[in-house]
Structure formats: C-alpha cells, structure tokens
Amino acid sequence: MGIPISISIVLILLFGSFLGWINGYVTVKTGVHSFIVTLATMSIYFGFMTLLTEAEAFRKLPETFTDFGSMKLFNKYISPLLLLSIFTCFVLFYLFKFTDIGRKLIAAGANPDAAELSGISVNRMFIYCHMLSGFLAAVAGIMLTSRIGAAIPSMAGHLGFDWLLPAFLAPVIGGTLLSGGKVTVFGTMLGAVLVTLINNGLYLIDVGEFWVRFFLGLILLFAVLLDRAREYFTSKNSIVS
C-alpha cells in the first residue's frame, strides 16, 4: 500500500490495542471468563485475517525491516530482537512499579472489591489490561514478522495454538499469580527463556511432538498447583497478620 514502515508499525500497535479492547469490553459486559473470550476471539480474528488476505503470504517487506530481525550485534552473538525484548521488560517494570495506572492495575487484580471502594474503576482497569495484552501481542507479531522476513497468515493460526501453552507457562513459572494481583516482569521473561530451553531441548533429543506437549503440559499443571499453593499461603498469612 506504500505506507512508510514507521507509520505501519504504529498502526499495527494501535490495532493490536484495539483488538485487546474488544476482548476486555466483551468480557466486562458479558461476564464470561476472559480465558474463554480470548480463545473465541483468537479464532474469530484468525478467520477474518484469512478472509482478508486470502491466506497469501506477504514477502515484499522493506529490507530495513527484515534486516532488523536477521542481523546480529556484538560480534554476531546478540539479536536486536533480544534487546527489544529486554527494553520492553524494563518499560513494563516501570509501568507496574512506578506509575499510578500500573499500581491501579495491580490493585484491581489483587482485590477488586477493595479497589472499587478506593475509587478505582475495576472494569476500566480490566479493559486496560486487555489493551496492554493486545499491544504486546502486536509487538511480538512485528518481531516475528521481522525475523521470518514475511507475513504468512497460514502460519499465524498454527503459532497461535503452538504458543498458547508456553504463553501460560512462562508467567506462572516466573512467579505471576494467575488470580491476579502479582506481576513479575523479569520473572516472566526468565520463565519464557526456561520454557524455550526446555522446548528446544526436547526437540533436539528427538523425543517426538507428543512427548514435547506432554512434558510442557505436565510442567504447566505443576506450576498451576504451585501457584494455587502460593496463593493459599499468601492469603492465610495476610489473615493471620
């Protein structure tokens, strides 16, 4: 379409935030669990994308964009995508730790009733969380497209389902509570690194797709049980104190 790459990136980030807003708005208005809404809209969005693109890959991307994803820095050891990921972590850490809206997001997740009593609009914070999630998903999509060197609609659906389990596993391993109220940004990144190492290691020893899924699912189950136990003891200690 001849749109400059910088403007295209901004539009993609805004569109990702908008899709996240839809998820949050539907969840707030219907009361359906956000997990169900997100799974449903993932399939809907993929269907619309396939319809609009006719499942054809876009390979004629600007060289500056594709080179960014393939280049290596510091004697060809470090990808700029890794540096971008670390930068994103620092931005999120600052958001949750030092900004008013970040603290409100945490408070709304930790105790919605108490947050409402203190004047925080929990529904609004809930929608903001989904918008942030959509924004970060757009960032990940841009990074992946830059690394591959093409936008391939047919691949997006497979990646969405393939990354669904690791996307849940990384934050839980990193220390984020699934029930909300506690976010560990750097822990989540380390969890993502650990999940990637486990995933790649299983593929390297050629255990087969079934066993890769089996072990990742087993780790997720253990992590969720650990999350529940941590949540239980945290609430118990708060009651005692």
Task: List the predicted regions and their residue ranges.
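Hydrophobic core segments of alpha-helical transmembrane domains in multi-pass membrane transport
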Residues: 13-16, 42-47, 84-94, 130-141, ...
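Membrane-helix interface residues
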Residues: 3, 30-32, 99, 120, ...
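Helix-loop-helix "hairpin" substructures at the membrane interface of multi-pass membrane proteins
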Residues: 4-12, 18-23, 74-152
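Membrane-interface helix caps of multi-pass small-molecule transporters
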Residues: 18-29, 51-52, 94, 98, ...
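Transmembrane alpha-helical segments in multi-pass inner-membrane proteins
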Residues: 137, 151-216
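Hydrophobic alpha-helical transmembrane segments
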Residues: 6-14, 36, 82-87, 127-131, ...
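Transmembrane helix-bundle core of multi-pass membrane transporters
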Residues: 30, 34-99, 125-128, 148-160, ...
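Cytosolic-side transmembrane-helix boundaries in multi-pass membrane proteins
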Residues: 113-124, 198-241
